[in-house]
Structure formats: C-alpha cells, structure tokens
Amino acid sequence: MYYAISQARVNAAPATMLRPQRPGDVQLGASLYELVGYRQPPISSSSSSSSSTASLLPKPAREKAEAPLAEPRGPAPESGGARADAKEEQQQQQLRRKINSRERKRMQDLNLAMDALREVILPYSAAHCQGAPGRKLSKIATLLLARNYILLLGSSLQELRRALGDGAGPAAPRLLLAGLPLLAAAPGSVLLAPGAVGPPETLRPTKYLSLALDEPPCGQFSLPAGGAGSPGLCSCAVCKFPHLVPAGLGLAAVQAQFSK
C-alpha cells in the first residue's frame, strides 16, 4: 500500500511540475526532493535577474548592453588632449601679447620721430602759422612739408652758389669748393635749427668774400701713395676740415675754367 502511494507520487511529480501551479495546490515534486535530501544552491537575486535578462536578450542587444561598461576607461586620453589644447592656447596668447607690445613700441617710436620732425619743420611752415596754434599736423602732412622744405633748401643753396660765382671774381672757385663743406659741416645749426639763421645782412656774399680773401689759399697736399695726378688734401680754414680735392678740380683748373 505504501509502495503504491509513493510510486504514484513519483509518476505524478513531472506532470505536476509541468502543469501551471495554482494558489492552494501543493507541489508534490518539492516534497519528493526533500525526502531524497536534494537542495538547490542559493542564487542571488541580482545575478539571477541579470542572467535571466541576458539569456532572454538576443546577441546584438547583449553586446550593446555590455559596451557601456568599457566606456569609463576613455577619460584619460580626453584629459590629455584638453591639457594640450590649453597649452597651445596659452602659447598663442603669449605670442599675441609679444606682437602687440612690439607694434605698440614701433608706433611710439614713429610718433616720437614725427614730433621731432615737426619741431624742425613747423617754424618754417606758413600753413602752420595761419592755422590754429594747438592743431597738430598729420604724419602725411608732416612728411610732405619736410620734402618741400628739403627741396627749398637745395634750391636756396644752388642760388647762393650761383650768386657767389657771378659776383665774386677770382675768389669764386674757392667759395664754390668751400661752400658745400661749410653748409654740410653742421646742417642742424646752420639750416635746420630754429633761430640759428641770422638777419639777412649776415648771409650776404660780401661776408663770404672777405672770409675767403683773408684766409690763405687752399693748400693741396698729395697723398703719400699718390702720384702727380692723384687727388690732394685741402686743410684750409675755410673748409674747416680736410677733404679730398680731385686733381681735375684743383684751384688752377677751376680758375682756368671760369676765366674762359
């Protein structure tokens, strides 16, 4: 009798396990496993849920779910790239500061040079005298005024030489030779400095004529390595400093040319 009941339980266990269980039904297979002594090993809920979810998902979806776990390893190269970008930006800022400082210094030097040129040119500028006293000339106007002033000085020098050559007689060659070194020796004090130009009577040809007549004639000394046709050195008081006098422009040659 007992053997028949137990055999019926064993035969009915698979059917009971396969059949959906209802509330209130007793699972016969569990009591059979307890009688035999079999116990199922404990499984954590998280691992069981993840394994069951992973087993239910298809293979591509499983790979996508595992991919985000490997992403946190990427911040190290990203931080290095950000550091390199910050360093490059800092270098560009330093280079920009150097360029700006160099350009600022260049403009300051240009402004100082223009101010110095205005101090020399403006006393001789009629436009500046007619204009407002506090008005400052632009850079282009200052350069154009300086160009015209230099041309005026050159023409004045040529007129002075022509006047001295026409009315000085035999002393004209000496004045022609000595005129350029005299005016070129100190251009700042003779021609450019404000107030250095004296009254008109001090610039008359008679002053230079008397100076040329009082001084001894130009002495030409041959250079040590030169021959008969080599240039000589003029060291007279009119010339103020020694300079080369070519043989073709000696005193005798110039006098002969003007006597024709």
Curated annotation (Swiss-Prot):
<feature type="domain" description="bHLH">
    <location>
        <begin position="94"/>
        <end position="153"/>
    </location>
</feature>
<feature type="region of interest" description="Disordered">
    <location>
        <begin position="42"/>
        <end position="104"/>
    </location>
</feature>
<dbReference type="GO" id="GO:0048663">
    <property type="term" value="P:neuron fate commitment"/>
</dbReference>
<dbReference type="InterPro" id="IPR011598">
    <property type="entry name" value="bHLH_dom"/>
</dbReference>
<dbReference type="InterPro" id="IPR032657">
    <property type="entry name" value="Olig1_bHLH"/>
</dbReference>
<dbReference type="Pfam" id="PF00010">
    <property type="entry name" value="HLH"/>
</dbReference>
<keyword id="KW-0805">Transcription regulation</keyword>
<keyword id="KW-0238">DNA-binding</keyword>
<keyword id="KW-0539">Nucleus</keyword>
<dbReference type="GO" id="GO:0046983">
    <property type="term" value="F:protein dimerization activity"/>
</dbReference>
<dbReference type="GO" id="GO:0006355">
    <property type="term" value="P:regulation of DNA-templated transcription"/>
</dbReference>
<dbReference type="InterPro" id="IPR050359">
    <property type="entry name" value="bHLH_transcription_factors"/>
</dbReference>
<keyword id="KW-0217">Developmental protein</keyword>
<comment type="function">
    <text>Promotes formation and maturation of oligodendrocytes, especially within the brain. Cooperates with OLIG2 to establish the pMN domain of the embryonic neural tube.</text>
</comment>
<keyword id="KW-0804">Transcription</keyword>
<dbReference type="GO" id="GO:0005634">
    <property type="term" value="C:nucleus"/>
</dbReference>
<dbReference type="GO" id="GO:0003700">
    <property type="term" value="F:DNA-binding transcription factor activity"/>
</dbReference>
<dbReference type="GO" id="GO:0014003">
    <property type="term" value="P:oligodendrocyte development"/>
</dbReference>
<dbReference type="InterPro" id="IPR036638">
    <property type="entry name" value="HLH_DNA-bd_sf"/>
</dbReference>
<protein>
    <recommendedName>
        <fullName>Oligodendrocyte transcription factor 1</fullName>
    </recommendedName>
</protein>
<dbReference type="GO" id="GO:0005667">
    <property type="term" value="C:transcription regulator complex"/>
</dbReference>
<dbReference type="GO" id="GO:0003677">
    <property type="term" value="F:DNA binding"/>
</dbReference>
